[in-house]
């Protein structure tokens, strides 16, 4: 399954189950993530991809910003594992 498809599923879920600020926060990071990895299959996203992506979008920002964005990506992959495909590995967990 493509990353872009799962991003939409994840965001739709949170639009119905989370607070607006939480949704906006997820949208901000996942839209950027989707621009780079949207056409990739989930299985193709590696830990190295995650670290490179975070370096690009958090360059010059506080460590707390990097942690929050990493946490959002980890939550995204955990959602996939728990709700869509348990065979997927969370690249944030490595």
Residue ranges of model-derived segments:
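N-terminal core-binding DNA-recognition domain of tyrosine recombinases/integrases
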Residues: 8-21, 28-94
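Gly/serine-rich nucleotide phosphate-binding loop at the start of the catalytic core
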Residues: 3
